[in-house]
């Protein structure tokens, strides 16, 4: 438990209105308490960490000067919103973030009136805030709308689409965009914009000009000298900072300013709050600010398990191999013998397992920043020239490049391999990061081959199979570890479209896809049923399915994907096309967005863990429950 007496000011804040009761001179102390509280609370429970530390002062300044929730703050992505949650009535629940029944890891409209827009994916804030500002303008409403977006999120095209629209509107809506520039997304930010922002913040000449003005005029500037200094600085800024870019798009640019300097933030926001039209404030922050270890390892402290803040993160010893680890090793091994292989990631080098590859093959590694659409069409272009690109991407982010997958890759039957990480149930990050839809939206694409491994060894073989296949392929694997089947060092391939019979039984055939093979086998062996590791979602093993249909009374398909349009639907479609009438029971994820909880809890909730599969079978066929295999034996 956290001792609230250690936070005398913070404990008085239940809403931003309480924050606004403090004097400006007290806000520095409030910020220190908030930062320390964040360190202590996340240390106890785990969660997103470094990003929130970097926006403590900015969060306080915004809630202090703006009349939230009437004025609306739209946070991009949401990694940085723990301070926002603490100041908006959720301080005592912050330790429940990511836990079942607890606070959501990102802003969520159903959770608080201060969460104006649900987020989780990047670069949506400006579009959403613009929509709010337009409606406010139409209604004659004077409320303020602010979008807070990081420099990493500003690498996505959607952000510029929104800027372009907002800056070109007439009459222009009142919108403030705050560019939180910390040189990071989750991994290090990359690309031309990042370099340009770096030139702006690192310009010795501009800083010298600014400091010279301070020395000459001090704090005793008249209105005339203040206007002169502003024009003088704006003139020189055009030579060093991205003001030209944003102002050409119709935004008035202010900055860059120190995002940890509360007086500077308050001064800038007081002015901007009175201005009309599109405004952009550029603030410089440090991810992990105030916790030295996080400042020194911003990637490692992006999201953390519970830890002792006095000691920092403890490096784990030998750990069980994850599916991401399997992909990482396979990629380097295949690259060693296949010079055509090129690897692409949309800003997820660490998460997708590309660190080693980026070090060993830097000329064959392409981090395109948060630009999934570009990543996929880039891969398509590479494939037209004989390369074999591998796009390493989370399932949830593949949704953002779906048109490019269909139009630019599949339509042209180009040789692109998609390594789809975090497929199916993901867990604590909640609905915004779930991969519950991917089998459905990939299976329906013509020319696409789609596989899901039952274990680590099979994952490696599927990646090799996909690499050597002519045409678009997706290998979809889950977050975390598997059953513990150690992969071979070889680069063996599987026969395309051939399933694996795991156990021969009678009456009922359990058809497991991906991670659901394990519970299917556990239950099927105990009940004497046939168990199949389907391996391929597309193409299905037609020969085996027709044979099983002749010898079994019913099929049960089991998948960690929504039932609608999923792998089980493919089985039903195949039998229907063959004129075979056979009962099929589909077990899978519900037609709903699953909330945050552990993977184990979500699989159990959906009824596709071993106990759930067992219960589903017995509810339909009670005669299976003989003395030799009671329900308690299956877990």
From Swiss-Prot:
GO MF annotations, alphabetized? 1-deoxy-D-xylulose-5-phosphate synthase activity; magnesium ion binding; thiamine pyrophosphate binding
Q: Which SUPFAM superfamilies match?
A: Thiamin diphosphate-binding fold (THDP-binding), TK C-terminal domain-like
Concerning Gene3D superfamilies, the annotation shows: 3.40.50.920, 3.40.50.970
Could you list this entry's UniProt keywords, alphabetically sorted.
Isoprene biosynthesis, Magnesium, Metal-binding, Thiamine biosynthesis, Thiamine pyrophosphate, Transferase
Which Pfam families does the entry link to? DXP_synthase_N, Transket_pyr, Transketolase_C
Q: Which domain of life is it from?
A: Bacteria
GO BP terms: namely: 1-deoxy-D-xylulose 5-phosphate biosynthetic process; isopentenyl diphosphate biosynthetic process, methylerythritol 4-phosphate pathway; terpenoid biosynthetic process; thiamine biosynthetic process
Name of this protein: 1-deoxy-D-xylulose-5-phosphate synthase
Designated gene of the protein: dxs
């Amino acid at each position: 438990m956290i001792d609230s007496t250690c936070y005398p000011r913070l404990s008085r804040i239940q809403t931003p209105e309480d924050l606004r009761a403090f004097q400006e001179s007290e806000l520095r102390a409030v910020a220190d308490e908030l930062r320390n509280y964040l360190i202590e609370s996340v240390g106890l429970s785990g969660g997103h960490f470094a990003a929130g530390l970097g926006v403590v002062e900015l969060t306080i300044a915004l809630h202090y000067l703006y009349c939230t929730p009437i004025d609306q703050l739209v946070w991009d992505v949401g990694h940085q919103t723990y301070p926002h949650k603490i100041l908006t009535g959720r301080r005592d629940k912050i330790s429940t973030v990511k836990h079942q029944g607890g606070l959501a890891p990102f802003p969520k409209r159903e959770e608080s009136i201060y969460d104006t827009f649900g987020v989780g994916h990047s670069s949506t804030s400006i579009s959403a805030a613009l929509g709010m500002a337009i409606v406010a303008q139409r209604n004659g409403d004077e409320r303020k709308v602010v979008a807070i977006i990081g420099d990493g999120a500003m690498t996505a095209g959607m952000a510029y689409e929104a800027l372009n629209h907002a800056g070109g509107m007439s009459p222009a809506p009142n919108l403030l965009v705050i560019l939180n520039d910390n040189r990071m997304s989750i991994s290090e930010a990359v690309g031309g914009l990042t370099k340009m922002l770096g030139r702006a913040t690192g310009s010795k000449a501009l800083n010298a000009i600014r400091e010279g003005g301070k020395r000459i005029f001090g704090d005793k500037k008249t209105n005339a000298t203040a206007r002169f200094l502003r024009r003088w600085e704006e003139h020189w800024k055009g030579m060093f900072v991205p003001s030209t870019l944003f102002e050409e798009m119709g935004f008035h640019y202010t900055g860059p300013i120190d995002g940890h300097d509360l007086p500077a933030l308050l001064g800038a926001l007081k002015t901007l709050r009175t201005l009309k039209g599109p405004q952009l404030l550029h603030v410089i922050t440090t991810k992990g600010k105030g916790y030295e270890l996080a400042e020194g390892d911003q990637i490692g402290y992006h999201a953390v398990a519970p830890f002792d803040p006095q000691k920092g993160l403890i490096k784990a010893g030998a750990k069980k191999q994850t599916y991401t680890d399997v992909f990482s090793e396979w990629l380097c091994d295949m690259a060693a013998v296949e010079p055509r292989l090129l690897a692409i990631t949309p800003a997820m080098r660490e998460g997708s397992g590309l660190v080693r590859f980026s070090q060993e093959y830097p000329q064959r590694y392409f981090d395109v920043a948060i630009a999934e659409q570009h990543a996929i069409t880039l891969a398509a272009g590479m494939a037209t020239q004989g390369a074999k690109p591998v796009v390493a991407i989370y399932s949830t982010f593949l949704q953002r490049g779906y048109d490019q997958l269909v139009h630019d890759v599949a339509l042209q039957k180009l040789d692109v391999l998609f390594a789809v990480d975090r497929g199916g149930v993901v867990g604590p990050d909640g609905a915004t990061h779930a991969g519950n839809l991917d089998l459905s939206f990939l299976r329906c694409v013509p020319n696409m081959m789609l596989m899901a491994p039952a274990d680590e060894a099979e994952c490696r073989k599927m990646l090799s199979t996909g690499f050597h296949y002519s045409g678009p392929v997706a290998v979809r694997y889950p977050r975390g570890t598997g059953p513990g089947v150690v992969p071979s060092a070889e680069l063996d391939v599987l026969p395309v479209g051939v399933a694996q019979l795991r156990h021969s039984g009678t009456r009922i055939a359990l058809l497991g896809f991906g991670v659901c093979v394990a519970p299917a086998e556990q239950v099927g062996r105990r009940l004497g049923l046939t168990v199949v590791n389907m391996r391929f979602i597309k193409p299905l093993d037609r020969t085996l399915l027709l044979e099983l249909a002749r010898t079994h009374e019913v099929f049960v398909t089991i998948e960690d994907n929504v039932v609608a349009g999923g792998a089980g639907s493919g089985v039903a479609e195949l039998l229907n096309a063959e004129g075979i009438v056979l009962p099929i029971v589909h077990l899978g994820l519900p037609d709903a967005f699953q909330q945050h909880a552990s993977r184990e809890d979500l699989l159990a909730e959906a009824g596709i863990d071993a106990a759930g599969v067992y219960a589903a079978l017995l509810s339909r066929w009670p005669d299976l429950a003989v003395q030799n295999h009671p329900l308690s034996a299956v877990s």
